[in-house]
């Protein structure tokens, strides 16, 4: 018995691939099964006839099996005779497939008898009961094999199904041995003509019973499903023994045939879906639709939120502040603000629709995310903060208006001062050749060595009767040194004499001579005025210099009036009084001169009209002189003119700055005067 067990155990190990691959065998498998049946029939042909005659009344399903045997015998008779001459070892090996089905039939019976799934054919040395059971099992085995083969011919992709899932077997053999069982559930075809006795090849030697040692032997585990090529080669690899399998797991595994069928179906389905999924780049159509729609909804929500924030910020900014605020740009492409799609979606991204579907709930204004790729110059203000901050600004309306008016006023004043500064600092108009020669004649009066030094300046001051200290003389020379080289040359002298600011300071100082000390800053203008009054310069030089300064005074007066108008408008709008010191600081020299003149005209005009001091002062720059009279009396009245031209005091009536030129000695008033001074001829007669 031990011998028999040792021989059958390797075959049991090699039987598992046959059981797993028997469900999907092709025509090759069908031929192999027929060869195994023929070989088995040759070994027990003599005993088959006797057993059939004895078992026919005893077998419960005997008449039901005869048509199958007859059909199988007819099929076997059509096989070529060369198949019987094949090696017996292969026939024994291929015979294991049909016999394993017989094992499932025997185990499903309630008698509890177990038949070995595999074993070598034994001679007819068994009892009658064993022969009956073997005969009935053999008949069922042949029928089930033929039905499976018939189905395989019609549909190779559908293996024979098992009844173990619908009818679980609760036998001791399943719990002890754990062997896979299978029961074929194919419908029985209609019986055909013929008897079981007519089949000479139906007899198969009986199989030995399973002993207690065989029950305790480890079961054969199912193998991994193989490809069609492996299934074709499985027949020849059955005879080779395999290493002992590991110990079985406690729960009984499902039948290997069912598991192989499920795995094959799953594998085929996955292989068919794999190209489509690889092309789409997703795990399934459901995930694709969910991911794509989610991305579209997120993009639409982000765009809608950004658009609402932009409109709201623009409206609030326009309402609360008059200043222009740079808004968030929304004219960029839509794809710039679209976040990237998930990595599982490799299809090209499409632009989001401009309108939001009706079934999409719009997000809250303050909770919508802002896209990170959107470039913006101004951060959008949250709407929730603006809603409750707006009423707080209402009581502060008056203060805001005052602050705004003050800011606007300061900006206008700054603009006016900037205009005046630019007018002062602009490049002086280029002097003509005649004008330059006229200033050259004035420069030569100092008789210096090509420059004005302290010695020559003191001599001129003594000639005209001015008294200056040496410190004041040095200060005057330093102020005249424009380039700072320590020498007052002709270039520096021209810069001083054409300086507009110095000129208007000199005019103001002449008006207020009685109350202002000598100014070294305007000393050269004072000397020029006296020299023109003394007619110490050539006639051409006097005319050019007078015309030049009259033009400068006219431009300055018009500019002062414009400044006065602008400042008056600002003062009326702001209605904020200035102190006297602020007024003095804000006024320009031209405006200050006009203000002083108007104030002096208003004070005691009638009383001071007959005063000798009401005479127009002897200020030079008057070209309308009688040339013959000047030449005739220049030598005799030189010293007296110098003494008379030294101003000691000035009367309040100084309106002679704008007198209309007429007869000699005329004192008529005119606001559109073309000449600065016109009363010098009255003194020369």
Swiss-Prot record:
Polar residues biased stretches: 70-108, 323-338, 374-385
SUPFAM superfamilies per the UniProt record, alphabetical: EF-hand, Formin homology 2 domain (FH2 domain)
Residue ranges constituting the EF-hand domain according to the UniProt record: 468-503
Compositionally biased tracts (Low complexity): 18-27
Compositionally skewed regions (Pro residues) per UniProt: 241-255
SMART domains recorded: EFh
Listed transmembrane segments: none
One term of GO molecular function: calcium ion binding
Tissue: Expressed in testis. Exclusively expressed in haploid spermatids and very weakly in spermatogonia, spermatocytes, and Sertoli cells as well as in interstitial cell.
Coiled coil: none
Region of interest called Disordered, as start-end residue ranges on this chain: 1-289, 302-385, 656-685
Keyword hit for Calcium: yes
Residue spans of biased composition, Basic and acidic residues class: 1-14, 256-266, 666-675
The keyword Calcium is annotated on this UniProt entry: yes
Keywords: Calcium, Metal-binding
Protein residues bound to Ca(2+): 481, 483, 485, 487, 492
Role this protein plays: Involved in the differentiation of haploid spermatids.
Name under which the protein is recorded: Spermatogenesis-associated protein 21
Species per Swiss-Prot/TrEMBL record: Rattus norvegicus (Rat)
